[in-house]
């Protein structure tokens, strides 16, 4: 249904945001070295 689609999109967005945050943290850490 519509609600499960919304939940799926939200989960995908959360995963994408977490990956982006992790990548940014890695970049910041490598530049700090």
Curated annotation (Swiss-Prot):
The terms describing its cellular component in GO are: extracellular region
Q: Which residues carry this modification: Leucine amide?
A: 33
Compartment annotation: Secreted
Keywords of this entry? Amidation, Amphibian defense peptide, Antibiotic, Antimicrobial, Secreted
Q: Which GO terms describe its biological process?
A: defense response to bacterium
Q: Does the keyword Protein transport apply?
A: no
- Is Repressor included in the keywords of this UniProt record? no
Q: In which tissues is it expressed?
A: Expressed by the skin glands.
Q: What does this protein do?
A: Has antiparasitic activity against trypomastigote form of T.cruzi (IC(50)=0.25 uM) in vitro but not against L.infantum. Probably acts by permeabilizing cell membranes. In vitro, shows no cytotoxicity against macrophages. Has antibacterial activity.
The family this protein is said to belong to: Belongs to the frog skin active peptide (FSAP) family. Dermaseptin subfamily.
Which protein is depicted? Dermaseptin-4
């Amino acid at each position: 249904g519509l609600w499960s689609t919304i939940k799926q999109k939200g989960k995908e967005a959360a995963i994408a945001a977490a990956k982006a945050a992790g990548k940014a943290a890695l970049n910041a850490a490598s530049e700090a070295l």
